[in-house]
């Protein structure tokens, strides 16, 4: 509608009755903060993509850093750098792009300067320090191991302060002090982003700290998995989708010089996304130990998401009606068209992948990686590039240095995306088919996991070419931005604008009468017509506090309906009598597993599928994970599943040698050497506080509460003796192997999956009355595996 064109809102649709309604006020915009975020976006975008390129090389060349000192090499491993790449891409590149868009558009849509210049600067520098902290801690192995929420609790606290206090407070106070009566659609999406990310961040990161660099989640196992993917899915929704839709609704009409196609469609688009998106997270956990009702719920809402998502894409593309001739000559519009197209592709593929039968094939494969990158590179990346090219001449008050170079960036970037995602789609589908393939006798056609890895290597090499082209495009952007900046004036012009102060007294225009009124139709039809006209929504748009509360209510209500049953209904996590908490040494080994990022390559979740149970063993049960903080189910299998690794009875010496040189036992392995684990000495003194924290969270420890260190040392001696007896060394790197960090990790790996087949502890016999004669009780038969497990799930093909 034309009243929403180019970010301008109507001011004459209602009458103002206050005597001060014509009071004019002068103001200027704070474009300095936008320049800062824009420069940071380009810089971090280059760093994030170069890091991704390095990670891609490390996957196919695991020995790339072997020449370095082992401790340095450990910080540059694939498993340590992959979370760094994802965090840099999302929160550094994507985050700074969001902030640049919000600070630029909000001031113009509200006809006022940001409420506080100081909060804006605190926000900028605080966010950059958070990114630097992530860049330091993640390679050091300081991580929570939750996707998109890897950062430890001190950084999480800083994020909460910077996001809600500096950014959210500044934004909401700007809305409160605006000089434009109605809030434009872009502002709605910004509100939803700020509110929902706050809720997600706080409740997913509730932990018990045991030090500055380590904490345990208050959630365990299945509940932790549900909370993580409630957060993980909606982090994509409300950090990588809604703010970029706000960006689209402001900058696309500006660039096209056309009004937004449909105001009504934008209303439907917004509220549908806000309400439906929050329910969809459990579709990431199909066929896992999560109760089936929860994952089915997630699937249904994911499928429903397709319609409002495409409503937004259509609204964006049809905004270009009458302006398609400009697309051929304007690189900004080219970026927006392709970005919106990738948004449409991703929001179709997402619901598709949520369907259980398709997810059974795609989950844990590179198909998910291709899906994520088509959205990140195509939607988020190209929408950001379009915004940057549009802003550069306006912020630096000079002509864009090279329009031709921007064109080259577009074409090279587009080709790069295609060369990246197509091979990875092929790799993912190939992996899924090979893992499930059975011969005529019902046996695995590819019994060795390494066969699927070797088939993927050519595709992994091909995606490096695509990634290189994408990085080359960002280098072109950086050059163009730098040269444009060098052509800036010696002093920026800062125009002063005037606008009337908003009156505190306001009378809405009456809602127009339905054209069906007075016609021979039911009263219900007249009321429905008035509702569908959506004039009522115009009233909501002038109340930022009410609008924010309604958005918050929609998000919280949807979340509670999903989360509360999982925590209150005990049958969701049936008890397994034989499951016991980890020993002190195993608990330390589990923390090493988390620190090394093993979850990036290995899952610990065997799905109830014939091919998986033949390959890995008995499928996983919800009750097995009640002491797992955080859960380690993983989302990708570059290596085999480890949920039953302890049941395989692999020797401890095999694991020791495998950590030192993985390819010695598995030819063609892409696992790097973990020699540093053999060289490092385990800090036994720190184990006690880990046990104390686990006990505080419910682990039923007894003498471990006072003897954790000595118990860990005794168990380490047992494993060391076993390794030595099997031909291993007595000492390594100047210390006895019983003191090695690798011993703790081996203890943990050897424990995995064994509880399900253990004999459950028996209750002590009740005391007999003193006067009763002593009688001999015959021995009872040991509990079988079936007795120990109190839950069943049908196995599916």
Report each predicted region and the residues it spans.
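The canonical Cys-X-X-Cys-His
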Residues: 589, 595-604, 655, 745, ...
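Post-cleavage N-terminal segment of exported redox proteins
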Residues: 527-582, 713-722, 748-777, 787, ...
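Electrostatic cytochrome c docking/interface patches
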Residues: 570-594, 608-609, 731-738, 786-787
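Surface-exposed patches in mature extracellular/periplasmic domains of secreted proteins
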Residues: 601, 667-674, 756-765
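Short pre-active-site segment immediately N-terminal to redox-active cysteine/selenocysteine motifs
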Residues: 585, 594-600, 605, 638-641, ...
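Hydrophobic cores of alpha-helical transmembrane segments in multi-pass integral membrane proteins
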Residues: 2-3, 35-142, 153-175, 187-212, ...
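Short, Lys/Arg-rich, polar N-terminal cytosolic tail immediately upstream
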Residues: 1-31
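Electron-transfer interface patches adjacent to heme c in soluble/periplasmic c-type cytochromes
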Residues: 551-556, 614-741, 796
């Amino acid at each position: 509608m034309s009243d929403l064109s180019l970010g301008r809102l109507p001011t004459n649709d209602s009458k103002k009755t206050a005597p001060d309604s014509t009071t004019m006020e002068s103001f200027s915009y704070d474009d300095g903060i936008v320049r800062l975020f824009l420069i940071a976006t380009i810089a971090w975008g280059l760093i994030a993509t170069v890091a991704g390129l390095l990670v891609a090389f490390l996957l196919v060349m695991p020995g790339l850093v072997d020449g370095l000192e082992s401790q340095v090499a450990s910080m540059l491993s694939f498993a340590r750098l992959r979370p760094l790449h994802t965090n840099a891409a999302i929160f550094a590149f994507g985050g700074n792009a969001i902030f640049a868009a919000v600070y630029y558009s909000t001031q113009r849509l509200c006809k006022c300067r940001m409420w506080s210049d100081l909060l804006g600067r605190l926000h900028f520098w605080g966010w950059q320090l958070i990114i630097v902290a992530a860049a330091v801690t993640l390679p050091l192995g300081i991580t929570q191991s939750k996707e998109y929420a890897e950062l430890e609790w001190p950084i999480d606290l800083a994020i909460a302060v910077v996001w809600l206090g500096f950014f959210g407070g500044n934004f909401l106070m700007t809305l409160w002090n605006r000089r434009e009566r109605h809030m434009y659609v872009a502002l709605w999406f910004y509100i939803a982003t700020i509110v929902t990310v706050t809720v997600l961040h706080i409740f997913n990161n509730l932990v018990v700290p045991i030090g500055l660099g380590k904490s345990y989640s208050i959630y365990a196992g299945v509940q932790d998995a549900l909370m993580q993917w409630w957060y993980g899915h909606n982090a994509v929704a409300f950090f990588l989708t809604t703010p970029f839709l706000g960006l689209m609704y402001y900058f696309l009409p500006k660039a096209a010089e056309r009004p937004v196609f449909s105001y009504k469609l934008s209303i439907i688009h917004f509220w549908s996304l806000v309400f439906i998106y929050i329910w969809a997270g459990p579709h990431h956990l199909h066929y896992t130990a999560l109760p089936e009702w929860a994952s089915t719920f997630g699937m249904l809402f994911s499928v429903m998401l397709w319609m409002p998502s495409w409503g937004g894409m259509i609204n964006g593309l049809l905004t270009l009606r009458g302006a398609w001739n400009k697309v051929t000559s304007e690189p900004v519009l080219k970026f927006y068209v392709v970005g919106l197209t990738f948004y449409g592709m991703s929001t179709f593929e997402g619901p598709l992948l949520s369907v259980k039968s398709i997810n059974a094939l795609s989950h844990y494969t590179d198909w998910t990686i291709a899906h994520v990158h088509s959205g990140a590179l195509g939607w988020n990346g190209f929408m950001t590039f379009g915004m940057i090219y549009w802003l550069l001449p306006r912020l630096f008050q000079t002509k864009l240095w090279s329009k031709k170079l921007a064109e080259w960036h577009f074409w090279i970037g587009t080709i790069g995306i295609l060369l990246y995602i197509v091979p990875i789609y092929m790799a993912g589908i190939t992996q899924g088919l090979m893992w499930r393939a059975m011969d005529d006798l019902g046996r695995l056609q590819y019994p060795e996991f390494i066969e699927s890895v070797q088939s993927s290597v050519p595709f992994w090499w091909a995606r490096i070419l695509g990634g290189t082209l994408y990085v080359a495009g960002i280098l072109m952007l950086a050059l163009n931005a730098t040269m444009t900046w060098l052509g800036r004036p010696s002093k920026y012009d800062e125009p002063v604008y005037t606008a009337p102060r908003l009156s505190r007294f306001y009378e809405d225009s009456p809602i127009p009468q339905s054209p069906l009124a007075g016609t021979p139709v039911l009263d219900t039809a007249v009321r429905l017509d008035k509702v569908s006209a959506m004039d009522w929504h115009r009233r909501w748009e002038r109340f930022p506090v009410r609008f924010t509360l309604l958005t918050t209510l929609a998000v919280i209500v949807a979340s509670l309906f999903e989360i509360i049953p999982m925590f209150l209904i005990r049958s969701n996590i049936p008890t397994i009598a034989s499951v016991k908490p980890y020993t002190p040494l195993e608990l330390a080994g589990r923390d090493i597993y988390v620190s090394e990022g093993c979850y990036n390559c290995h899952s610990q979740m065997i799905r109830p599928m014939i091919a998986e149970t033949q390959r890995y063993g008995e499928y996983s049960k919800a009750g097995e994970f009640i002491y797992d903080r955080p859960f380690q189910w993983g989302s990708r299998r570059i290596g085999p599943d480890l949920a039953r690794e302890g049941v395989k009875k692999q020797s401890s010496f095999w694991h020791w040698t495998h950590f030192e040189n993985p390819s010695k036992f598995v030819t063609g392995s892409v696992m790097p050497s973990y020699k540093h684990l053999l060289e490092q000495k385990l800090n036994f003194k720190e184990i006690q506080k880990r046990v104390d924290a686990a006990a505080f969270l419910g682990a039923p420890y007894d003498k471990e509460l006072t003897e954790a260190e000595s118990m860990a040392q005794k168990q380490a001696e047992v494993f060391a003796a076993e390794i030595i007896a099997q031909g291993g060394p007595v000492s390594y790197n100047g210390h006895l192997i019983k003191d090695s960090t690798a011993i703790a990790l081996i203890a943990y790996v050897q424990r995995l999956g064994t509880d399900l087949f253990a004999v459950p502890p028996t209750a002590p016999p009740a005391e007999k009355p003193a006067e009763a004669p002593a009688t001999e009780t015959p021995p009872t038969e040991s509990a079988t595996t079936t007795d120990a497990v109190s839950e069943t799930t049908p196995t599916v093909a």
